[in-house]
Amino acid sequence: VVYTDCTESGQNLCLCQGSNVCGQGNKCILGSNGEKNQCVTGEGTPKPQSHNDGDFEEIPEEYLQ
């Protein structure tokens, strides 16, 4: 599982795979072709300060389809 930090709404690209690391009240949305995913304003999980196991919450499966 790969985690990519993204903190600026609509600016930073994010992987959206296995976790939502947008933080700051943002959520990660998938690009149409699986690329250029973006953080947008919306419910999201907090962005942790470290990259240790257990710091990330999994994205519910319905968002991975």
UniProtKB/Swiss-Prot annotation:
Hirudin is a potent thrombin-specific protease inhibitor. It forms a stable non-covalent complex with alpha-thrombin, thereby abolishing its ability to cleave fibrinogen. Glycans are attached at T45. GO terms for cellular component: extracellular region. Belongs to the protease inhibitor I14 (hirudin) family. Its main location: secreted. This is Hirudin-3B'. Residues 55-65 have a biased composition (Acidic residues). Gene3D superfamilies: Thrombin Inhibitor (Hirudin), subunit I.
